UniProtKB/Swiss-Prot annotation:
Note describing how the cofactor binds: Binds 1 Mg(2+) ion per subunit.
Protein name in UniProt: 3-methyl-2-oxobutanoate hydroxymethyltransferase
Localization of this protein: Cytoplasm
Source organism (scientific name): Helicobacter acinonychis (strain Sheeba)
Subunit structure: Homodecamer; pentamer of dimers.
């Protein structure tokens, strides 16, 4: 049975947690119904990431993404994808305290069909996570390289290169697990500590730039399909030269129009 026909039921957190130590979790970003529909039969998880602020709106970071933006794109993704577990990124400033976080998480649940919300931060977010999970919100954690902290960190820096960082990462992971996160994203973490975290906690880890030992992997679709050639992170594998292919198609279309080859008789009404 092909991957396209194998999955028919909505994937839940229980399904994903049952995959730990048995089967890798396949995750990808999406921001609209068109791509979500294409990804639907293949992936387990779709993240409506605040990365859309960079890939869709050409911003330098994720910080100006708004809750309204995330709601709009989550609704679109949910219209296209019916099977995957859909996670909505909580944008910068939308979970600055427990009251704000709960209000905005409830708004995501009420206005979209998202399965879960994702927030960045370590053990300092444990109490907030507990508050959300007590109200029935599924929370996905995110530690390591955290894009919402890029200005504080002075850039996008890999974590876990020394013993102090490794200790903090493990403490963060254990605290978040205890607080109730259902999944944990490990971004930009050195492979050895990502492996340790994955072994130590009972919930699945989803890696991005954190080595092959995580319970699953996620990539930004526009990176893996080759739509950005100005910068490519080390961890990205391009499976398609998307930008090149699309530009060639548009060039062919433009040439056909200029030369009067499009539309032809079969493409015209009489």
């Amino acid at each position: 049975m092909s991957m396209q026909t194998a999955k028919t039921k909505k994937i839940t957190l229980n399904h994903l947690q049952a995959k730990k130590n048995h089967e890798k979790i396949i995750a990808i970003t999406a921001y609209d119904a068109l791509f979500a529909q294409m990804f639907d039969p293949i992936v387990d998880v779709i993240l409506v990431g605040d990365s859309l602020n960079m890939s869709f709106f050409n911003q330098n970071d994720t910080l100006s993404a708004s809750l309204e933006m995330m709601l709009y794109h989550t609704k679109a993704v949910c219209m296209g994808a019916k099977t995957p577990f859909i996670i909505t990124d909580m944008p910068f400033g939308s979970y600055k305290d427990e009251k704000t976080a709960l209000k905005n998480a409830i708004k995501v649940y009420k206005e979209t069909q998202a399965s879960a919300i994702k927030l960045e931060g370590g053990k300092e977010k444990a109490k907030l996570v507990k508050t959300l999970t007590n109200e029935g919100v599924i929370v996905v954690g995110h530690i390591g390289l955290m894009p919402q902290f890029v200005r504080l960190d002075g850039g996008y820096k890999i974590k876990g290169k020394n013993e102090e960082q490794q200790k903090k990462l493990l403490e963060d992971a254990l605290s978040l697990e205890e607080a109730g996160v259902g999944l944990l994203v490990l971004e930009g973490i050195t492979t050895p500590i990502a492996q340790v975290i994955t072994q130590k906690i009972k919930i699945p880890t989803i890696g991005i730039g954190s080595g092959k030992d995580c319970d699953g992997q996620i990539l930004v679709w526009s990176d893996m399909l080759g739509f950005f050639d100005s910068f490519k992170p080390k961890f990205v594998r391009e499976y398609l030269k998307g930008k090149e292919l699309v530009q060639k198609a548009i060039e062919q279309y433009a040439d056909d129009v200029k030369k009067g080859f499009f539309p032809n008789e079969l493409e015209s009404y009489h």
